[in-house]
Amino acid sequence: MKSLIMKTLYILGALYASVASGQQNTVLPEYPNSYEIVRDVVEMPVGRQMGSGNAIDIDSRGNVWVFERCGGNNGACPESDVDPVLQFSPEGKLLSSFGSGMFVWPHGIVVDEDDNLWIIDAGVIEGEKGNQIFKFSQEGNLLLELGEPGVRGDGPGQFNEPSDLAIGPDGTLYILDGHINPDSNRRIVHMTAEGDFIESWGSKGYGPLQFEGPHAIAVDSSGRMYIGDRTNNRLQVLSSTGELLAIWTHWGRPSGIRIVGDTLYAVDSESRAAVGEYGYNPGWHRGIYVGHLDGTITDFIPDPSPSGATSFPEGIGVSDEGVIWGASVGDREVLKFVRR
């Protein structure tokens, strides 16, 4: 049975490779859309612009935490004195902020069950800062620091452009280490809650248990991992011990993933049909997928500007009530999606 499963997975990998080389994928079915988009949902201080961002999450009180790129995008934070970590009330009022001068390229934020904040800095200033993960209290007190500041590496305590993080049901950390740059890592790093290395899985490539542009990770209540293997236009599902369980291409090109209860949310912020264009994924459309942990999709929220630049959220957070919050890179705004 195991050999049959692996054979099937390798066939899927080969099918993906043919798609990546330019063949047409399956056309996206017409899923229902039960959500409406709400814009202008957060208030920024006078003179302070929202930066690009894919890092957003919700705490136990419904407050929205955004880790944005200091009013700009690439290179903005090292030249800025603004706070990139922003806390908003459910109504969008700015409650607090911190983090000025601490980060290179904000790329992820996760709120744990104790309402502490896990911050992912995917950029690097060689020998100085970046390539790290931090745990903060909501008051901005540093509780834990992972990785070596300003160092690229693939050792047990090192990272190279970490993209995202998820917390397992046992409190251990699953860190998605790597991004789209050719020399960055392509792996999942499993650590204790205190940051001690346990093991890692994955490598660079297009086959099963390989990643090319890993960008998002979530873990369900059973410890299964859901990895947005974005550049490979797929979502890979792994067991808590790193065994490959499934490869899904029908969830688009995942940039952000969240799980709330038994519901899986994934946002595709990049799919494009133009041959040779970044994000080439013909037959799929940008938007937010909502569905079950078995891979069944129940809803799809389409990008209202599918032919433009990256305009839809790249990262999402979901409240306990199922309200979806999104942070976008291109439009540099926070959006809300509520059920009709």
Residue locations for each model-derived region?
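N-terminal secretory signal peptides that target proteins for export/translocation
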Residues: 1-4
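Bacterial N-terminal signal peptides
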Residues: 7-18
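Sequence-structural signature of mature extracellular/luminal beta-sheet repeat domains
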Residues: 23-340
